[in-house]
UniProtKB/Swiss-Prot annotation:
Keyword Glycoprotein carried by entry: no
Name by which UniProt lists this protein: Complex I assembly factor TIMMDC1, mitochondrial
Native organism: Mus musculus
Subunit architecture: Associates with the intermediate 315 kDa subcomplex of incompletely assembled complex I. Interacts with TMEM70.
Highest classification ranks of the organism: Eukaryota, Metazoa, Chordata, Craniata, Vertebrata
The gene coding this protein: Timmdc1
Transmembrane segments: 80-100, 137-159, 165-185, 188-208
Length: 285
């Protein structure tokens, strides 16, 4: 007799035909005790990984460390914003103070004061109002401008992991465009162009100063990140070693505890009272 004809294959089997098959023997071999044990040991310990991706570096930039502190780049952006606010306040407030005092004196020639001190005090109050008004106006604008510029520049540098003059140009274009966006599309385009033209030479100047100092900010950042990664990798390896030694310690502990427990159980059984004899056994006696 010839061999029976093969069973017809369904359309679903035909559709899954090109895909690789996994047989039960292969699955059993893959789930061998050594493989399962190694997989279970490593499941509770996560690999620290490396900061090779740009998004990983950006997340690390804005993340806090073990002491709940931000990175040095964020601290630099904050300090630069505060310094820019102080400089902007002085830049806008001091000329406004002088101008407001002079204008008040010119406009109050016909006024009558009780004494000279009253006149000087009135002029000083007018100058102080001008200092606060125009100083605050220049202060917050300068602080926001510097913050946006440094944030964009630092973000591009960290994401691409290198310094480039184009980062300063892009940061200047973004900052200038945002500050002129209230003037419409023309203001946005004009502000972006002016910002890029001003950012490029500023970037070249800062890069030249960094090279002259011997170590750039990016080189220092890479050293710090490399040291941090090595520290986390060492911690991960030590935790992995502890995880690998834990089953052995548990097994040795069970081997020590089991004989003692068995002996104690036997002693408890022997110390139990014997069962009373049945009436049938008593009649035989």
């Amino acid at each position: 007799m010839g061999a029976p004809p093969p069973a017809p294959r369904s359309r679903l089997c035909g559709a899954w035909g090109p895909f690789p098959r996994v047989f039960a023997a292969g699955a059993v071999a893959a789930d061998s005790p050594g493989f399962v044990e190694d997989r279970e040991q490593r499941s509770g310990v996560s690999d620290p990984g490396s900061l090779e991706s740009g998004w990983d570096r950006l997340r690390q930039l804005f993340a806090k460390d073990e002491q709940q502190r931000f990175s040095k780049e964020i601290d630099y952006i904050y300090r630069a914003a505060v310094s820019a606010g102080i400089i902007g306040w002085a830049y806008g407030g001091i000329p406004a103070f002088i101008y407001a005092k002079k204008r008040y004196i010119e406009q109050s020639q016909a006024e009558i004061y009780h004494n000279r001190f009253d006149a000087v005090q009135s002029a000083h109050r007018a100058a102080t109002r001008g200092f606060i008004r125009y100083g605050w106006r220049w202060s917050w604008r300068t602080a926001v401008f510097v913050t946006i510029f440094n944030t964009v520049n630092t973000g591009l540098t960290v994401y691409r992991n290198k310094d480039a003059m184009s980062h300063f140009a892009i940061a200047g274009a973004v900052t200038g465009g945002l500050f002129r966006i209230n003037l419409g599309v023309r203001g946005l385009v004009a502000g972006s162009i002016i910002g890029a033209l001003l950012g490029a030479p500023m970037g070249s100047l800062l890069m030249a100063l960094e090279k002259y100092s011997g170590e750039t900010v990016q080189e220092r950042r890479q050293k710090e990140w490399k040291a941090l990664h090595e520290q986390r990798l060492e911690e991960w390896r030590s935790s992995l070693q502890v995880t690998e030694l834990l089953p052995m310690e548990i097994e040795s502990g069970l081997e020590k505890i089991q004989p003692e427990g068995d002996a104690q159980r036997i002693e408890e059984l022997l110390s139990l009272p014997r069962n009373p004899s049945s009436p049938h056994q008593q009649s035989k006696h």
